[in-house]
């Protein structure tokens, strides 16, 4: 099976490596010629996964046409805010009925659309068959062959079963479900809560506060998801609770790192510029906040993070406001 992977960041590279190791014909589309050279010559992504050996069968290219030629599956791992532009530019090269799998986690800020909705918008008339893969999965650990479990959401149960097999290895276990919206929203909202968890840890608020943020963050994720048509049970799975716990506690989490650096007094622009990789939660906070306003859903942690990130509020003041909100049943 030929698979075109769009996006040569850490996660796109990790998934391309995983699939190449299974014997799939994988082409990784990357815009940076230095990354292409590193993957093809040195079997390493020098920018995002330096020091980790990639499968020698994996080939990278800057030529989108070369990557997409004859592809059975398009695996999109470009940052969420760039997805619409990339899909629009590649549409003339895509065939009708193509399988499109997203591994990006976020919500578009301009249109408040998930990746699946952007695929519907931009590939209308091509009848794409869509799926999303998400879950607790640091790229470096996947490349290192450490045990990982994720979930693949696909409305077509048969296609979901087929893709579940494609994306599974002895160290990478893929479950499937039909709740595409739930899988997408879990992967997006957890990034907002992860920034809050990093901020809390950086301010020295302790383990109790982190556990409270994770638990109440899960409640926010579920409330918004159900309001948008997802199943509440999905958020208790790998794309919800699983990814939330990992991203709020693991030091490889970019969004947690944003929170930690905010606690040190660094400015948001400097943090984002200095990371070298996309932390989806910064933009997603804005999108989730706007969605909550539109749907009339109460998301106090998200509202607090929006105030910190986009209104310049003092994090300690926002913690005080969260802790002194009107008391209620859980």
Curated annotation (Swiss-Prot):
Its recorded name reads Glycerol-3-phosphate dehydrogenase [NAD(P)+]
List the source organism: Nitratidesulfovibrio vulgaris (strain ATCC 29579 / DSM 644 / CCUG 34227 / NCIMB 8303 / VKM B-1760 / Hildenborough)
Q: InterPro entries given for it? A: 6-PGluconate_DH-like_C_sf (IPR008927), 6PGD_dom2 (IPR013328), G3P_DH_NAD-dep (IPR006168), G3P_DH_NAD-dep_C (IPR006109), G3P_DH_NAD-dep_N (IPR011128), NAD(P)-bd_dom_sf (IPR036291)
Catalysis: reaction(s):
sn-glycerol 3-phosphate + NAD(+) = dihydroxyacetone phosphate + NADH + H(+); sn-glycerol 3-phosphate + NADP(+) = dihydroxyacetone phosphate + NADPH + H(+)
User: Per its record, what are the GO molecular function terms?
Assistant: glycerol-3-phosphate dehydrogenase [NAD(P)+] activity; NAD binding
Residues annotated as the enzyme's active site: 190
Coarsely, its chief localization is cytoplasm
Q: Which UniProt keywords apply?
A: Cytoplasm, Lipid biosynthesis, Lipid metabolism, NAD, NADP, Nucleotide-binding, Oxidoreductase, Phospholipid biosynthesis, Phospholipid metabolism
């Amino acid at each position: 099976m030929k698979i075109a992977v769009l996006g040569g960041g850490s996660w796109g590279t990790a998934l391309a490596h995983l699939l190449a190791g299974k014997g799939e014909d994988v082409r990784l589309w990357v815009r940076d010629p230095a990354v292409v050279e590193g993957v093809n010559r040195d079997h390493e992504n020098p920018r995002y996964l330096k020091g980790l050996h990639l499968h020698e069968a994996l080939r990278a290219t800057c030529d989108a046409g070369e990557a997409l030629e004859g592809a059975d599956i398009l695996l999109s791992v470009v940052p969420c805010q760039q997805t619409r532009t990339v899909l629009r530019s590649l549409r003339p090269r895509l065939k009708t009925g193509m399988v499109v799998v997203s591994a990006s986690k976020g919500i578009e800020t301009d249109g408040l659309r998930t990746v699946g909705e952007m695929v519907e918008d931009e590939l209308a008339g091509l009848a794409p068959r869509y799926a999303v893969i998400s879950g607790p999965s640091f790229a470096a650990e996947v490349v290192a062959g450490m045990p990982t479990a994720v979930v693949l959401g696909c409305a077509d149960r048969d296609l979901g079963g087929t893709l579940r097999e494609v994306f599974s290895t002895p160290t990478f276990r893929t479950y499937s479900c039909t709740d595409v919206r739930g899988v997408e929203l879990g992967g997006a909202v957890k990034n907002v809560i992860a920034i809050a968890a990093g901020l809390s840890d950086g301010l020295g608020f302790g383990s109790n506060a982190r556990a409270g943020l994770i638990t109440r963050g899960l409640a926010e994720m579920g409330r918004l998801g159900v309001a948008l048509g997802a199943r509440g049970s999905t958020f208790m799975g790998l794309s919800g609770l699983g990814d939330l716990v990992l991203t709020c506690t693991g030091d490889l989490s970019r969004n947690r790192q944003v929170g930690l650096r905010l606690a040190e007094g660094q400015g948001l622009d400097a943090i984002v510029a200095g990371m070298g990789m996309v932390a989806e939660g910064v933009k997603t906070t804005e999108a989730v906040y706007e969605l909550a306003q539109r749907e009339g859903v109460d998301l106090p942690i998200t509202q607090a993070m929006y105030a910190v990130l986009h209104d310049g509020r003092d994090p300690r003041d926002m913690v005080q406001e969260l802790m002194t909100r009107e008391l209620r049943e859980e």
